[in-house]
């Protein structure tokens, strides 16, 4: 019998509910499916006996408290665990998870009956790390949703375990499940005071051992290119092709500083959205860099290119809206490494080697840390996230739940 008897069942139930976020929405949460899912989590938390369960109208988060069972917890830090409920911008309708029991670490895993989508060790060598594991995969038509419903299931199962085992001493624990992490707005209205933790963790990482406290600095740039459309037969010296302006802008950026050509601490510009006509074109970029100075230089370059093009054109035909999204939380956490050190100790106590390296992305913890609550990121188990080749090991999910409990125990000492 599994240590956390409802962990996998809970996860499978969660992923079958669509909770895709929508960056074009103006509501919080951005989709009604997230609203309903979070209401369901609130009821589940109440059913487990957690207290002060409430959903914030401002942020969409559900917060809950597991009271301390210590005789004296005056010197025990209140710890929080946070995960997001939304899934990335990929088909998440009618998720049909499949379980591959006792994977041999070598065989191809056919996702769909036709064999159009296959997990292979040649393309995904990390599969070799999972010999003997039970893997949950997709059926090839959707993502899985382990990012981050594995984290939700792990936190929920840890709380359930603590309630069933009152002999485990712990201080006060806070739980937060929120929306819209995938579109970068989830933590914008996170209320640190209402949450009430001294330190916190997002459970939103990948493979076993991941412990992250360094993220990108991040910004988004939306550009509008204004053209002039006339008949092609009389276009000479009159037509201004907005599509060509967008191409010229893109070609002015460093060709090798893109996601597919960078790694580690190397930053990039990423053009991920384009639409347009001769009359008007629109592009959207994300700008990423771990180094704040380089980050600011990247943003300035984008502004400078727009200004130069407008000067050459003799009028404003390139309009740029540049907005910061989040910052590298290392700036906050390196001032007080308590949360990181405790997570490292917890993993080592469990025989897990902490894998610490800069995240080529961000978490809700990036924003929450800058709000005054240090929030590094713990592994949740997912691999190949955001697409049809996503999978997760049930054994790694169990280990992630173990780490949550070990952190709680260490803080209670």
Swiss-Prot record:
<dbReference type="InterPro" id="IPR010161">
    <property type="entry name" value="Peptidase_M20B"/>
</dbReference>
<feature type="binding site">
    <location>
        <position position="204"/>
    </location>
    <ligand>
        <name>Zn(2+) 1</name>
    </ligand>
</feature>
<dbReference type="Pfam" id="PF01546">
    <property type="entry name" value="Peptidase_M20"/>
</dbReference>
<dbReference type="GO" id="GO:0008270">
    <property type="term" value="F:zinc ion binding"/>
</dbReference>
<keyword id="KW-0031">Aminopeptidase</keyword>
<dbReference type="InterPro" id="IPR001261">
    <property type="entry name" value="ArgE/DapE_CS"/>
</dbReference>
<comment type="function">
    <text>Cleaves the N-terminal amino acid of tripeptides.</text>
</comment>
<keyword id="KW-0645">Protease</keyword>
<keyword id="KW-0378">Hydrolase</keyword>
<comment type="similarity">
    <text>Belongs to the peptidase M20B family.</text>
</comment>
<feature type="binding site">
    <location>
        <position position="147"/>
    </location>
    <ligand>
        <name>Zn(2+) 2</name>
    </ligand>
</feature>
<dbReference type="GO" id="GO:0008237">
    <property type="term" value="F:metallopeptidase activity"/>
</dbReference>
<keyword id="KW-0862">Zinc</keyword>
<dbReference type="GO" id="GO:0005829">
    <property type="term" value="C:cytosol"/>
</dbReference>
<keyword id="KW-0479">Metal-binding</keyword>
<dbReference type="GO" id="GO:0043171">
    <property type="term" value="P:peptide catabolic process"/>
</dbReference>
<dbReference type="InterPro" id="IPR002933">
    <property type="entry name" value="Peptidase_M20"/>
</dbReference>
<dbReference type="InterPro" id="IPR011650">
    <property type="entry name" value="Peptidase_M20_dimer"/>
</dbReference>
<feature type="active site">
    <location>
        <position position="86"/>
    </location>
</feature>
<keyword id="KW-0963">Cytoplasm</keyword>
<feature type="binding site">
    <location>
        <position position="84"/>
    </location>
    <ligand>
        <name>Zn(2+) 1</name>
    </ligand>
</feature>
<dbReference type="GO" id="GO:0006508">
    <property type="term" value="P:proteolysis"/>
</dbReference>
<feature type="active site" description="Proton acceptor">
    <location>
        <position position="181"/>
    </location>
</feature>
<feature type="binding site">
    <location>
        <position position="386"/>
    </location>
    <ligand>
        <name>Zn(2+) 2</name>
    </ligand>
</feature>
<dbReference type="InterPro" id="IPR036264">
    <property type="entry name" value="Bact_exopeptidase_dim_dom"/>
</dbReference>
<dbReference type="Pfam" id="PF07687">
    <property type="entry name" value="M20_dimer"/>
</dbReference>
<feature type="binding site">
    <location>
        <position position="182"/>
    </location>
    <ligand>
        <name>Zn(2+) 2</name>
    </ligand>
</feature>
<protein>
    <recommendedName>
        <fullName>Peptidase T</fullName>
        <ecNumber>3.4.11.4</ecNumber>
    </recommendedName>
</protein>
<keyword id="KW-0482">Metalloprotease</keyword>
<feature type="binding site">
    <location>
        <position position="147"/>
    </location>
    <ligand>
        <name>Zn(2+) 1</name>
    </ligand>
</feature>
<dbReference type="GO" id="GO:0045148">
    <property type="term" value="F:tripeptide aminopeptidase activity"/>
</dbReference>
């Amino acid at each position: 019998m599994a240590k956390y008897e409802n962990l996998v069942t809970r996860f499978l139930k969660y992923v079958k509910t669509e909770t895709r976020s929508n960056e074009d929405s103006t509501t919080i949460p951005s989709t009604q499916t997230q609203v309903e899912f979070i209401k369901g989590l609130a009821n589940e938390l109440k059913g487990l006996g957690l207290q002060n369960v409430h959903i914030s109208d401002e942020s969409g988060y559900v917060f809950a408290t597991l009271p301390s069972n210590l005789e004296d917890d005056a010197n025990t830090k209140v710890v929080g665990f946070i995960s997001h409920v939304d899934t990335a911008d990929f088909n998440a309708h009618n998720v049909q998870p499949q379980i591959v029991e006792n994977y041999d670490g070598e065989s191809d895993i056919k996702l769909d009956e036709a064999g159009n989508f296959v997990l292979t060790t040649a393309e995904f060598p990390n599969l070799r790390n999972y010999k003997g594991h039970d893997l949950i995969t997709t059926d090839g038509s959707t993502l899985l949703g382990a990012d981050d419903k594995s984290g939700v299931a792990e936190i929920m199962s840890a709380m359930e375990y603590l309630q069933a085992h009152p002999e485990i001493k712990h201080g006060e624990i806070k739980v937060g499940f929120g929306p819209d992490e995938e579109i970068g707005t989830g933590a914008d209205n996170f209320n640190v005071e209402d949450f009430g933790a001294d330190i916190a963790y997002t459970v939103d990482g990948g493979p076993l051992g991941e412990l992250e406290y360094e993220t990108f600095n991040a910004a988004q740039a939306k550009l509008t290119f204004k053209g002039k459309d006339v008949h092609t037969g009389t276009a000479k010296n009159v037509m201004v092709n907005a599509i060509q302006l967008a191409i010229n802008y893109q070609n002015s950026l460093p060709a090798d500083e893109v996601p597919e050509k960078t790694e580690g601490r190397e930053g990039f510009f990423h053009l991920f959205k384009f639409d347009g006509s001769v009359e008007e074109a629109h592009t959207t970029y994300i700008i990423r860099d771990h180094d704040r100075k380089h980050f600011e230089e990247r943003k300035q370059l984008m502004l400078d290119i727009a200004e130069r093009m407008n000067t050459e054109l003799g009028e404003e035909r390139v309009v740029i809206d540049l907005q910061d999204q989040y910052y590298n939380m290392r700036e906050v956490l390196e001032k007080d490494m308590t949360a990181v050190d405790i997570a490292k100790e917890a993993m080592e106590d469990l025989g897990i080697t902490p894998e610490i390296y800069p995240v080529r992305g961000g978490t809700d913890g990036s924003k929450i840390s800058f709000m005054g609550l240090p929030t590094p990121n713990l592994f949740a188990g997912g691999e190949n996230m955001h697409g049809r080749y996503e999978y997760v090991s049930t054994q790694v999910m169990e280990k992630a739940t173990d780490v949550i409990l070990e952190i709680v125990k260490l803080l209670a000492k």
